[in-house]
């Protein structure tokens, strides 16, 4: 299974390279690249629809044992802590959300070349993508939500390499990527459609690279609203950090009942990526269409 996953990453990378090689820009040696990614974009849902998962839903994420253990101890009450209330979404996740996207470009006043793109979403932070070949910071440099991103052209596609990220979720139910994670991103534009492909590598929490994509459509009347935020006290006991001990998260039983997952089958990890995993699931009231089913109680 591991070799299969690596093969998928290799084939995807190779396919993107072939696509780039066949473009007019690549045939001209990379000169005269004209693809412009700037503009206002609206999300056309993602391959997993809106990222608003049930607690315990780690299906399709190649978490290793440590990553799954970390996810299973997560308590949603953690988001009530003042330190978390105004926390922005990080680079490895934010493109998955349902908000509008604005990509601005910075143009050198002398050469007229694009030296950086500035993508921004609702509840995002500064996330510049540099095209001027600047040196990547040393490993001990400070990490941020946006990380450090440098980009190169592959034909008419833009390949972005991102490092120096803070620990952040890859799904908003406790599945995390550590500050050792790096992300390879491709921007691909076909007319008014922008395809955003991310491959997340994390040696600590992921057994294999996580490959996901989202689609955006160009629009002329979208708005990325401001996000003023002030943290407040929400009644949690001072000094308390909400979490569950391993094996004590009650919601893990609910997700098994909801989707008919047997006790000896994982709810996350490499095995859950592949179609064969679906064949191991049992019928449940939820999967039969009863959305009012009292699951797991």
What are these regions (language model features)?
Residues 3, 14, 101-103:
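Active-site bordering "gate/hinge" segments
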Residues 24-297:
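PEST-like low-complexity, intrinsically disordered acidic/proline/serine-rich tracts
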Residues 1-11:
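Bacterial N-terminal signal peptides that target proteins for export
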Residues 9-19:
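Bacterial N-terminal signal peptides
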């Amino acid at each position: 299974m591991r070799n299969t996953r690596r093969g998928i990453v290799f084939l995807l990378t190779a396919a993107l390279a072939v696509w780039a090689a066949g473009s007019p820009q690549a045939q001209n040696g990379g000169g005269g690249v004209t693809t412009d990614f700037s503009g206002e974009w609206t999300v056309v849902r993602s391959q997993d629809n809106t990222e608003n998962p049930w607690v315990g839903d780690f299906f399709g994420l190649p978490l290793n044992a440590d990553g799954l253990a970390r996810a299973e101890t997560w308590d949603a009450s953690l988001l009530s802590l003042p330190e978390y209330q105004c926390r922005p979404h990080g680079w490895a996740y934010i493109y998955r959300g349902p908000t509008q996207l604005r990509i601005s470009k910075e143009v050198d006043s002398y050469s007229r070349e694009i030296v950086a793109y500035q993508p921004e979403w609702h509840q995002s932070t500064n996330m510049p993508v540099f095209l001027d070949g600047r040196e990547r910071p040393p490993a001990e440099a400070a990490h941020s939500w946006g990380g450090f991103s440098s980009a190169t052209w592959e034909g008419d596609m833009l390949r972005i390499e991102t490092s120096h990220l803070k620990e952040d979720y890859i799904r908003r139910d406790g599945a995390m990527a550590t500050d050792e994670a790096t992300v390879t991103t491709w921007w691909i534009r076909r007319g008014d459609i922008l395809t955003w492909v991310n491959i997340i590598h994390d040696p600590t929490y992921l057994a294999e690279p996580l490959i996901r994509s989202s689609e955006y459509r160009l629009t002329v009347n979208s708005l990325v609203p401001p996000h003023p935020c002030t943290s407040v006290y929400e009644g949690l006991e001072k000094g308390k950090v909400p979490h569950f001990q391993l094996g004590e998260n009650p919601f893990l039983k609910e997700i098994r009942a909801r989707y008919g997952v047997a006790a000896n089958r994982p709810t996350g990890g490499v095995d859950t990526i592949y179609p064969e995993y679906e064949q191991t699931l049992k019928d449940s009231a939820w999967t039969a269409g009863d959305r009012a089913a009292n699951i797991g109680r």
